[in-house]
Design a protein with these regions (language model features):
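Helix-loop "lid/cap" segments that line or gate small-molecule binding pockets
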Residues: 31-38, 49-52
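Generic C-terminal helix-cap and adjacent flexible tail
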Residues: 132-134
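Amphipathic alpha-helical linker/stalk segments
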Residues: 1-28
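Short, residue-level hotspots on alpha-helical faces of the histone-fold
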Residues: 2, 32, 70, 74, ...
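Amphipathic alpha-helical packing segments from all-alpha helical-bundle domains
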Residues: 5-9, 24, 35-36, 42, ...
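Regular secondary-structure segments
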Residues: 8-15, 34, 102-109
Length: 134
């Protein structure tokens, strides 16, 4: 539930911006999540290994599809269609992005290892953009 709320808050924040580029939208959401986890180390420790659960749990996806069209999964799938992004397996790509964020940011946020999170972000965002390129 905590990671689900984190992504929901990120989407609500995105809706208040004028970001229209698909990759920039995904980076915005990831940046929002990282910044929130940086502000709340206890939350980071609590959900560090299960960040993708809030987006990818099949039960949640089914409920959200009925209740809320605007979740990260739907934004991602809609974005790749609208932008003609050719991904071999969009589900796997989204899962990889979220897992990459969850697994690599933990040490950067808590221990500044291998870099502080602010120094690490450009590397992370470059990899995410590469995953989203045609």
């Amino acid at each position: 539930k905590k990671s689900e709320k984190l992504f929901s808050d990120a989407l609500n924040s995105l809706r208040k911006t004028y970001i229209t580029n698909f990759s920039d939208q995904i980076i915005y959401i990831i940046n929002y999540v990282i910044d929130e986890l940086t502000k709340n180390p206890l939350l980071l420790k609590f959900i560090s290994k299960n960040l993708s659960w809030g987006v990818y749990n099949k039960t949640i996806l089914k409920l959200q599809d009925k209740v809320e069209e605007n979740n990260l999964y739907n934004l991602f799938m809609q974005g790749i269609k609208e932008n003609n992004v050719k991904l071999e397996n969009p589900d796997v790509t989204l899962f990889m992005i979220i897992e990459l964020v969850g697994s690599t940011c933990f040490n950067s946020i808590l221990y500044k290892d291998p870099l502080s999170i602010e120094d690490y972000k450009p590397y992370l965002y470059k990899v995410i953009r590469n995953l989203l390129e045609n």
